[in-house]
Amino acid sequence: MTITQVKIKKLENFSGSLPEYATEHSAGMDLIAANEQPITIKAAAIQLIPTGIAIALPDSFEAQIRPRSGLAVKHGITVANSPGTIDADYRGEIKVILINLGKEDFIIEKGMRIAQMIIAKYERILWEESISLMETMRGSGGFGSTGV
């Protein structure tokens, strides 16, 4: 396995520990809330939650912000734009857009694990316009065409 080093900066509001893998085979690292005061996410509402970190990803890498399954299943708290994308040239604070799909208000406390961050390599492409596309068995079937 290749290990890529990524620079990370602790901002003034940083609290707790840097994102880290929970197990040897974890794909994502937990992000920690760095809000000074508790933030209430009302039912059906969205809040932007600070993490207190900024990163410098290498070219051809992105960070994906995804929900934590425990928050989603127990409280209906998920990432509104999942997966959120942090581009390699972004140097500002990583913030997480959380939405409360539950029926009750939910309070985000400083130090709470709020989301997962996955670092992924990607390729850029160039479009090649074409009059036709190669046929496949699936064709243009979509939105449930391969079964439920």
UniProtKB/Swiss-Prot annotation:
One of its GO terms (biological process) is dUTP catabolic process. Its EC number is 3.6.1.23. Substrate binds at R68, S69, G70, N81, T85, I86, D87, K95. One of its GO terms (molecular function) is magnesium ion binding. Gene3D superfamilies: 2.70.40.10. Pfam families: dUTPase. Its cofactor is Mg(2+). Pathway: Pyrimidine metabolism; dUMP biosynthesis; dUMP from dCTP (dUTP route): step 2/2. It is an enzyme of class 3 (hydrolase). It catalyses: dUTP + H2O = dUMP + diphosphate + H(+). Keywords: Hydrolase, Magnesium, Metal-binding, Nucleotide metabolism. Belongs to the dUTPase family. This enzyme is involved in nucleotide metabolism: it produces dUMP, the immediate precursor of thymidine nucleotides and it decreases the intracellular concentration of dUTP so that uracil cannot be incorporated into DNA. This is Deoxyuridine 5'-triphosphate nucleotidohydrolase. It comes from Rickettsia rickettsii (strain Sheila Smith). The lineage of its organism: Bacteria, Pseudomonadati, Pseudomonadota, Alphaproteobacteria, Rickettsiales. The gene is dut.
